[in-house]
């Protein structure tokens, strides 16, 4: 639920007392008994009005001094910037409107296999010799040559 009176959110630009002291002179519920639209702004008591008038004079002098100092510092900063960095204005220094195509990202080179593996693999792939050595193996383990001394193992 909102308030119908916008006066609690607005402040008079000439009234510095409420911003300095940090409080408003409105009722806490936001309703005002005033019916005049010009008096919707906050009312300052006479004590605060005197303080406000005294405070305004030094502040106006300070703001004028600050603006003069700021103007001087801005001019100095502009001069310093002109000395150091300048935007290129020649036609050969200006970047082209067409974006350049970037080269592909660098990749890790493939590992070269060692020569010893290369030699071994090349012989295997090119020369495949199939040997049948079953007869030689049978001759080595022939039961007649062992003189029937083969004993069977006993299982426990």
From Swiss-Prot:
Keyword Phosphoprotein listed: no
Entry GO MF terms: protein kinase inhibitor activity
Source taxon at top rank: Eukaryota
Alphabetical UniProt keywords: Cell cycle, Protein kinase inhibitor
Cysteines joined through disulfide linkages: none
InterPro entries tied to this protein: CDK_inhibitor (IPR053115)
Regions of compositional bias (Basic and acidic residues) in chain numbering: 67-77
Region (Disordered): 52-90
Function: Probable cyclin-dependent protein kinase (CDK) inhibitor that functions as a repressor of mitosis in the endoreduplication cell cycle.
Name of the featured protein: Cyclin-dependent protein kinase inhibitor SMR10
Species for this entry: Arabidopsis thaliana
């Amino acid at each position: 639920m909102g308030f119908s009176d916008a006066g609690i959110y607005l402040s008079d630009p000439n009234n510095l007392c409420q911003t300095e002291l940090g409080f408003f002179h409105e009722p806490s519920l936001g309703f005002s008994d005033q019916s005049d639209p010009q008096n919707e702004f906050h009312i300052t008591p006479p004590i605060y009005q005197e303080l406000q008038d005294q405070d305004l004079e030094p502040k106006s002098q300070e703001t004028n001094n600050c603006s003069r100092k700021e103007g001087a510092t801005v001019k100095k900063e502009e001069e310093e910037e002109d000395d150091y960095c300048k935007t290129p204005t020649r036609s050969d220094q200006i970047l082209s409107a067409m974006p350049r195509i970037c080269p592909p990202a660098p990749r890790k080179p493939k590992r070269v296999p060692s020569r010893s593996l290369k030699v071994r693999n090349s012989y295997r792939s090119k020369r495949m010799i199939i040997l049948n050595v079953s007869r030689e193996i049978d001759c080595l383990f022939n039961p007649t040559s062992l003189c029937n001394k083969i004993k069977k193992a006993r299982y426990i």
